[in-house]
């Protein structure tokens, strides 16, 4: 994979920034004023007029500024030039359930993949007024100030975060065992409800690690590059290279990565023994 030059990366990052900030204004205007909330199929998998209006705004910007790129949008699916190596993965409202309830943990996430690898990302949380940006080889920022991951090295000193997939009512393949075990052996596990918020919280050092299953590329593309450029590490659960379409992700400050991966393997046997 040959990266764009620095000037091109800067332009692409500006595109992502314009997109998330524009959508963020829409989310701010509509919060608390939603006329219609729908379920997309599974219980708890919500979509609102805010999702749709924010996504439309992002799509308009991408179609205008990068018309020859492909787009993968949560609500609209695949759009644009489908044979392009550049794919914009967009989640116009990551944390819809939080947003619908007025809980201030949602964001707009816009990431750019090149040959399946995240190279540019912007995440804007309109409730915190926080803009995270990152580009491959260029570092990451929060409101244009450089950020880095935490220096926590011990799992028992770490604060983690996870999420529960929408299909959790339909499958036994959940992360409940890991949640219980890691709550037992760390300083705590949080459940935020927005993958992009979780990833950026690890990127800026508020949290030390994050894992989840049932994710889509638009949930994590932007957050991955922001976290990696802040010094973090992102892999599959077993530390193998991440395939972004796999839906499973382990993301940490790098220092606890091996131990957290091992703990995920230990969780189910521990839980069975705990309740034996």
Predicted feature locations:
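A short, compositionally biased
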Residues: 33, 106, 134-138, 228, ...
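Solvent-exposed alpha-helices and their adjacent loops that cap or buttress functional pockets
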Residues: 39, 80-82, 101, 115, ...
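Generic detector of well-ordered alpha-helical packing
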Residues: 52, 56, 75, 92-95, ...
